[in-house]
């Protein structure tokens, strides 16, 4: 496994792979790798001959200095895990390499609409930071395929939109969320939890499943459902942050045409901000079914 910190070095190596006719898959990470990240690596291997992983804690996407400073950094352990997965190349740049003139003078990439709703509304600039670094890493690595976790549902939607709008010749693969045995979504931030907090953390996923069950049971009073869910989180000692129930395709409000909804949740627990999501298939009556029901009612 080769490790590069300089842009020119990794570019030359990727060019060599391409000259050899090898397909390149890319997995961008911020390090502190867990089984969820390794699942992305394994999925990337299914699509390409070579897997490149980046480890870079991107300061542009953090809206709080303490969150950036507290983000776990475990480079040696990360490299050991990636070596065990047979990764060919790891890119480990510093902020000075990625942003040589600082953040204030950095050209940025902004996806309008999707970047400013939901989580983007409460974290101004967050998705701009994500799309800027992902775009820059794509330009450096020049992958054929890139894998992202579905746990960051809105982020994946934003990246897909960026790739589509900018006509990037990169296939984006969404990989299902990997969970602990108790249902908690795997996350680098889980390491910030105390033993007691870790025991309470699965309540987020359980509450999400309760919302899903309520929706499948026919509840469409979403504001009331969200209020009940927040009460469940508070009762378990979590501080609710955001809960959204939206159309999974557009991330807009659910309409009669919505065929799949998504529950987007976040909550604070100690020093950690936990996030999760779940899609819910909606029952949509066809015109034939509606007509049949109307005829039955008339006959009665």
Swiss-Prot record:
- Record's subunit section: Homodimer.
Record: residues binding ATP: 30-37, 149-152, 178, 186-189
What's the stated role of this polypeptide?
Answer: Catalyzes the condensation of pantoate with beta-alanine in an ATP-dependent reaction via a pantoyl-adenylate intermediate.
Catalytic activity, EC: 6.3.2.1
An annotated GO BP:
pantothenate biosynthetic process
**Gene this chain is encoded by:** panC
Q: What class of enzyme is it?
A: ligase
Where does the chain bind (R)-pantoate?
61, 155
Entry-linked Pfam families: Pantoate_ligase
Q: What are the top taxonomic ranks of the organism? A: Bacteria, Pseudomonadati, Pseudomonadota, Gammaproteobacteria, Vibrionales
* Further comment found in the protein's record: The reaction proceeds by a bi uni uni bi ping pong mechanism.
Similarity-based family: Belongs to the pantothenate synthetase family.
SUPFAM superfamilies in the cross-refs: Nucleotidylyl transferase
PANTHER family documented for this protein: CYTIDYLATE KINASE/PANTOATE-BETA-ALANINE LIGASE, PANTOATE--BETA-ALANINE LIGASE
> What reaction(s) does this enzyme catalyze?
(R)-pantoate + beta-alanine + ATP = (R)-pantothenate + AMP + diphosphate + H(+)
What residues does beta-alanine bind to?
Answer: 61
Q: What positions does UniProt annotate as the active site of this protein?
A: 37 (proton donor)
CDD domains hit by this protein: PanC (cd00560)
- What name appears for this protein in its UniProt entry? Pantothenate synthetase
- Compartments where found: Cytoplasm
Q: Give, as in the UniProt entry, the pathway in which the protein acts.
A: Cofactor biosynthesis; (R)-pantothenate biosynthesis; (R)-pantothenate from (R)-pantoate and beta-alanine: step 1/1
Which keywords accompany this UniProt record?
ATP-binding, Cytoplasm, Ligase, Nucleotide-binding, Pantothenate biosynthesis
